[in-house]
Amino acid sequence: MDASGVIDELKHRKEAFVTGHSGSSIADLRDVTLAGIFSNAAWIYVVSNNPSYRDSFWLDFLLNWMGLLCSVTVFGENPFLTGILGLSAVLLFGCISKGSKRETIKETVMDNGNQSATLTVYRSTMLILTSIAILAVDFPIFPRKYAKVETWGISLMDLGVGSFVFSNGIISYKRLKSGTELSKWAKIKQSLRSTVVLVVLGFIRLFSVKAVNYQEHATEYGIHWNFFFTLSLLPLAMIIFDFYNMRLRFVIGLIAAIIYELCLIYHPTFLDYLLNAERIDFISANREGIFSFVGYCIIYLAGQQVGSMFFPISRNPMQLLWKLVALSIFSSAISYVLLHYHPLQVSRRFASIGYSSMVISFNLLILTFDQLIVECLTSKPRVPKTYRAVNGNGMLVFLISNVTTGMVNFTFNTLDSPPYKAMAILTVYALFLAVFALKVPFKLKF
């Protein structure tokens, strides 16, 4: 077999490796989530008792980055162990480090002066885990239950996609409030600027994938569609909702999502089209990306509603915690009903209402735990430097992680990499992203 034949065979093997998966259990998603929360709690414990370690890059990287990496690789079958081992090691460290002076000075709950510490920890954890997963999924050490599902079910990577949209919705509320005095045309111009940047990124990814014959997964978004195109349409879609107040815009979005869901349930021909239609034109070729946009809109709008709780940032931490607890219980109850009694299963491929509900409820639970640990159980909020850096330049970090993933796949045969080699590559990759986030001299804003 010639070189081109070997490359084509490897491409098909890689495509098969990420195809046909059915997802993981709710318990698996819970355990990975808790591993990340416990890792950050361990870092907070160390720097609270040993202020000299607060600026330590290696402590930050070991607990916050390697903790997340290990939870989806070497401890992937039991990610809860990552958090437990991290906390145990830190408690032991605390017992033998009794000479350090504990900080007691009370600080504001703001991070970088314009955002709560909770939001910084939440967004950066989500971005780091997402960036790790998009490369780790190409290695056998990454459990297949965490890879994106084919059609029905939910996995860690499915949750990550929705979480990215949800977190963008939260932050968009701040821009929404700051732009209340802008004219309609000024808002449209602002939205178009964001859209153009993301469309350009989408086309760069599309052409690069086609040009180098990179592995593709058509049922993820379609033949030509990708996640950047979905993100690019959200600012434009939100222009329609600018005519309504916050609560009404969410209600309108929810009605649209319910109508879409009813079409999936009561119009078998529509569902059959989404599942089985030949890809003969632009719409049929990209139907996953086009029709799932309705679900991502409701996730984005829900994020805006939650953002209204965090901005302005002068709210009482405990008051905010109880609001998050109430919303978490309510959204979890809805998700439970949809998961167990709804006739249509959860589907990220079509962004069903069950999927949207799961994404919203999980993110609310994560925000609740982060609020509790970061701002309510400590004398003052503490945020790792790498978290602040990732949060402040999230889109650029996400873009670089996509580019680096492609470079790694062309450099190494990830599919046949043994565990030790996979962990070495992934550790260097995570280290590169952490250093890049800290040292990059500019920000990608739109």
From Swiss-Prot:
Enzyme Commission code(s) on record: 2.3.-.-
Glycan-modified residues: N114
Transmembrane segments: 32-52, 56-75, 76-94, 122-142, 151-171, 194-214, 221-241, 250-270, 293-313, 320-340, 350-370, 395-415, 422-442
Location (main, coarse): endoplasmic reticulum
Keywords: Acyltransferase, Endoplasmic reticulum, Glycoprotein, GPI-anchor biosynthesis, Membrane, Transferase, Transmembrane, Transmembrane helix
Keyword Flavoprotein: no
InterPro entries referenced in this protein's UniProt entry, alphabetically: PIGW/GWT1 (IPR009447)
Topology of the protein relative to the lipid bilayer: Multi-pass membrane protein
Subcellular location: Endoplasmic reticulum membrane
GO MF term set: glucosaminyl-phosphatidylinositol O-acyltransferase activity
Superkingdom, taxonomy of origin: Eukaryota
Pathway stated in the Swiss-Prot or TrEMBL entry: Glycolipid biosynthesis; glycosylphosphatidylinositol-anchor biosynthesis
GO cellular-component term (any): endoplasmic reticulum membrane
Family: Belongs to the PIGW family.
Free-text function comment from the UniProt entry: Probable acetyltransferase, which acetylates the inositol ring of phosphatidylinositol during biosynthesis of GPI-anchor.
Name of the protein in its database record: GPI-anchored wall transfer protein 1
Organism: Kluyveromyces lactis (strain ATCC 8585 / CBS 2359 / DSM 70799 / NBRC 1267 / NRRL Y-1140 / WM37) (Yeast)
Name of encoding gene: GWT1
